[in-house]
C-alpha cells in the first residue's frame, strides 16, 4: 500500500505534464498576418498558421467581436498529421479598431489570437498604388537604367572583344550621321541621359516616400531633411557639369580667336616673301634684258660703223 500510494503523486505529475505538453503543442505555432494590395480597391489581409493539432478553425473578427467572412480559406495536413491553416479577407472600407485573427482548437478548447491595427492612410488610393502589385513608375525607372547600362556594357564588350577598329569606324559613322541630322542635341542626350536619370532618382524617391505612411513622430523631420539633401545634390550635379561645359566652350572660343592673328601674319609674311621673290625675279629678268639690249646695240653700232668705214674707203679708192 505504501509503495502504491507513493506512486500516485508521480503518476499525477506525469499526467499533468503530458496534458500541458499537449496543450502547448496544440497552439505552439505563431499566427502571421500579412498585408497585400492586389489593386486599388482594397486591402487583402492574409492570416497563416501551421503545426496545429486538428481539428482547428480560423476566424476573423472586428473590434466589436463580429465575425468577418473570409474571402479565401485553405487547410492542409503534413505527414505527421499536423494542420496548416490559411485564410484571407478583403477590406474595402476603413476599419475602426483592430482586426483580429483567432484560431480555436476544439480538442484542447484553447484559442490563440493575433490583432493588427490598420491606419486610415492605408486606404487612400495613392498609398494603395504604392503598395500594389501593379507595374509602377519606380519599376519602369529601374528597368530603364538597367537596360541602358546593359546596352553600354554590350557595346564596350563588343568593342574590346572583336575587331575594335571596325567597331570604332561603325560608331564614328553612326555618330556623324546622328550629328548631321540632329546636331549637338543628339550628342548631349546620348552622353547625359544616364546622368539625368541618376539625378532624377532622388526627386522620384522623395515624392514616393512622402506619400508613404510611417507611424513615427520624426517622419516630417526626416522628410524635410531628405528634401534638402535632394535639392543640394541636384544643384551640385547640375551646376558642376554646366560650369565644365561653359569652361570648355570658352577655351574653345579663345583658342579659335587666338589662332586667327598668327594665321594672318603667316599669310602676310608668305605673301610678302612671294612678292619679294617675284620682284627679285623680275629685276633679274630686267637686268638680263638690259644686258642683251646693250650687247645688241653695241653689235649693231659696230656693224654700222664698219659699213661706213668701208664706204668711205671705197669712195677714196675710186677717186
UniProtKB/Swiss-Prot annotation:
Tissue-level expression: Expressed in skin, thymus and testis.
Paired cysteines (S-S): 47-101
Record key words, sorted: Disulfide bond, Glycoprotein, Immunoglobulin domain, Membrane, Signal, Transmembrane, Transmembrane helix
Any Pfam family matching the protein: C2-set_3
Source organism of this protein record: Mus musculus
Subcellular location(s) of the protein: Membrane
Residue ranges of domain Ig-like V-type in the record: 27-117
Cleavable signal peptide: 1-26
Membrane topology reported for the UniProt record: Multi-pass membrane protein
Other remarks on this protein: Encoded by one of the 11 copies of Skint genes clustered in the D1 region of the chromosome 4.
Glycosylated residues, chain numbering: 105
Name assigned to this protein: Selection and upkeep of intraepithelial T-cells protein 9
InterPro entries documented for this protein: BTN3A2-like_Ig-C, Ig-like_dom, Ig-like_dom_sf, Ig-like_fold, IgSF_BTN/MOG
Family under the similarity heading: Belongs to the SKINT family.
Extracellular-side segments: 27-139, 205-228
Residues in compartment: Cytoplasmic: 161-183, 250-319
Main location (coarse class): membrane
Amino acid at each position: 500500500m505504501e509503495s502504491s500510494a507513493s506512486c500516485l503523486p508521480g503518476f499525477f505529475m506525469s499526467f499533468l505534464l503530458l496534458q500541458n505538453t499537449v496543450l502547448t503543442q496544440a497552439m505552439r505555432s505563431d499566427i502571421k498576418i500579412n498585408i497585400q494590395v492586389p489593386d486599388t480597391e482594397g486591402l487583402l489581409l492574409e492570416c497563416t498558421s501551421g503545426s496545429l493539432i486538428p481539428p482547428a478553425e480560423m476566424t476573423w473578427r472586428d473590434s466589436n467581436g463580429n465575425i468577418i467572412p473570409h474571402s479565401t480559406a485553405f487547410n492542409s495536413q503534413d505527414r505527421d498529421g499536423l494542420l496548416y491553416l490559411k485564410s484571407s479577407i478583403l477590406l474595402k472600407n476603413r476599419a475602426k479598431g483592430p482586426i483580429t485573427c483567432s484560431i480555436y482548437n476544439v480538442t484542447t478548447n484553447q484559442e490563440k489570437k493575433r490583432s493588427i491595427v490598420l491606419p486610415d492612410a492605408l486606404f487612400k488610393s495613392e498609398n494603395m498604388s504604392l503598395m500594389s502589385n501593379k507595374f509602377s513608375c519606380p519599376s519602369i525607372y529601374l528597368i530603364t537604367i538597367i537596360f541602358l547600362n546593359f546596352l553600354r556594357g554590350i557595346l564596350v564588350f563588343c568593342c574590346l572583344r572583336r575587331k575594335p577598329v571596325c567597331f570604332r569606324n561603325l560608331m564614328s559613322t553612326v555618330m556623324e550621321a546622328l550629328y548631321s541630322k540632329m546636331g549637338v542635341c543628339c550628342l548631349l542626350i546620348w552622353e547625359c541621359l544616364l546622368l539625368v536619370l541618376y539625378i532624377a532618382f532622388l526627386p522620384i524617391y522623395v515624392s514616393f516616400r512622402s506619400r508613404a505612411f510611417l507611424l513615427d513622430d520624426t517622419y516630417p523631420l526626416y522628410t524635410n531633411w531628405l528634401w534638402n539633401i535632394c535639392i543640394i545634390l541636384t544643384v551640385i550635379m547640375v551646376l558642376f557639369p554646366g560650369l565644365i561645359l561653359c569652361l570648355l566652350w570658352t577655351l574653345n572660343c579663345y583658342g579659335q580667336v587666338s589662332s586667327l592673328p598668327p594665321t594672318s601674319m603667316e599669310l602676310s609674311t608668305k605673301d610678302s616673301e612671294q612678292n619679294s621673290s617675284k620682284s627679285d625675279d623680275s629685276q633679274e629678268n630686267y637686268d638680263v634684258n638690259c644686258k642683251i639690249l646693250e650687247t645688241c646695240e653695241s653689235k649693231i653700232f659696230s656693224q654700222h660703223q664698219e659699213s661706213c668705214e668701208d664706204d668711205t674707203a671705197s669712195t677714196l679708192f675710186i677717186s
